[in-house]
């Protein structure tokens, strides 16, 4: 299950135009603008350490909100959950989150046992007024 948590984080961070072949913006009004994303190695390789770094600018203060994550392997739903943005496990940021620049780096290994195939994800982030801050659709093949 830890792999799927990391995959969810990967889906959130893969929002740079350099990864335009695997992600698309599904929201009309992005209040969180990604300024850079890097992933090493690119593409990710099972059994190898992956480093993902991302930074962006939050355009409004957040006092609360949610992250909704849907991850599928083919037709099989792996993750379908909503998390409180203020208490995300492993996040260094706690509410209130002030507008401004943010960056974060994660390191993890995709297990060798992860099945090959097509993974899809949908991530939607909303603020304290249930307004969408960011929305991303991702397709990744291992």
From Swiss-Prot:
GO terms for molecular function: sterol binding. Gene3D superfamilies: 2.60.40.770. Disulfide bonds: none annotated. GO terms for biological process: sterol transport. Residues 1-20 form the signal peptide. The keyword Signal applies. Keywords: Lipid transport, Signal, Transport. Monomer. PANTHER family: COUNTIN-3-RELATED, NIEMANN PICK TYPE C2 PROTEIN NPC2-RELATED. Belongs to the NPC2 family. Catalyzes the intermembrane transfer of phosphatidylglycerol and phosphatidylinositol. This is Putative phosphatidylglycerol/phosphatidylinositol transfer protein 2. It comes from Dictyostelium discoideum (Social amoeba).
């Amino acid at each position: 299950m830890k792999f799927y948590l990391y995959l969810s984080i990967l889906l959130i961070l893969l929002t740079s135009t350099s990864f335009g072949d695997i992600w698309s913006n599904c929201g009309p009004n992005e209040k969180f603008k990604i300024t850079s994303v890097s992933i090493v190695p690119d593409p990710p390789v099972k059994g190898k350490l992956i480093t993902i770094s991302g930074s962006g600018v939050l355009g409004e203060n957040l006092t609360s909100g949610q992250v909704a994550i849907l991850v599928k392997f083919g037709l099989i739903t792996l993750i379908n959950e909503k998390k409180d943005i203020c208490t995300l496990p492993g996040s260094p940021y706690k509410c209130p989150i002030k507008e401004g620049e943010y960056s974060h780096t994660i390191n993890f290994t995709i297990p060798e046992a992860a099945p090959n195939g097509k993974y899809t994800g949908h991530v939607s982030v909303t603020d304290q007024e249930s307004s969408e801050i960011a929305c991303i659709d991702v397709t990744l093949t291992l």
